[in-house]
Amino acid sequence: MQLLTVTKPMFIPFIVAGDPRPDITIELALTLQEAGADILELGVPYSDPLADGPIIQRAAKRALRQQMTLKKAIELVPEMRKKGVKIPIILFTYYNPVLQLGEESFFALARKNEVNGILIPDLPFEESELIRKLGEATGIPLISLVAPTSKKRIEMIASNAQGFLYCVSSLGVTGVRDTLPETLNDFLTEVKRHSRVPVVVGFGISTSEQVSMLKNYCDGVVIGSALVQKIEQLNDLLQTEEKKEEALAEFRRYARSLTAPLR
């Protein structure tokens, strides 16, 4: 992924590959691009998702029932490109599926299928050297996560970040939250002080009010659970051929309403 040039705060949606079906994931990705997405985070379903709350866990179960795997998720990327998805696609996967595939095989497959970056939530920065080196060799940056911990650790992660830096808004799992920590703006300001790459924030961002509050402190917002919950609500309509376009239009409107403050 080339160095991002950020002229306005980015909208980075997260969806789960294969939820509710692989072919519909492609249409959802295109719909999000139409709604103004700058980068897409494509989640790989996993049976033990430590960083995810109940909404994304349920989506992962639905995708696993569709036989979605890490390899199949990677192979969805060129299918998205064929349908007109032009924005960068970041793969969000837990480490175990990467290990099972083999790190070098994983990067070779990701490169062949034009994945633009990867994010591994359960790989601590201190243990990420091999993955970062493979990422540098293949041009697929490992996106680092940074949480509100010690200033020393924040500085270490921020100064070594590739692609962009993903700030975790609060400790704990993903999910829809009514409120965000009062210290979040200070944390983002601290991270931006040390980072040479764009700084984005995610985990719990689920309303346009929260987006509006954060947009002046970061280079982008990641919205996952709120969108995945909407997909869950539209599940039956999305899978009914004569209702699908209507459901996609509703999803597009919802994504635009959440991110209106960014435009």
From Swiss-Prot:
Transmembrane segments: none annotated. GO terms for cellular component: cytosol. Gene3D superfamilies: Aldolase class I. Pfam families: Trp_syntA. Keywords: Amino-acid biosynthesis, Aromatic amino acid biosynthesis, Lyase, Tryptophan biosynthesis. InterPro entries: Aldolase_TIM (IPR013785), RibuloseP-bd_barrel (IPR011060), Trp_synthase_alpha_AS (IPR018204), Trp_synthase_suA (IPR002028). Pathway: Amino-acid biosynthesis; L-tryptophan biosynthesis; L-tryptophan from chorismate: step 5/5. Tetramer of two alpha and two beta chains. This is Tryptophan synthase alpha chain. It comes from Geobacillus sp. (strain WCH70).
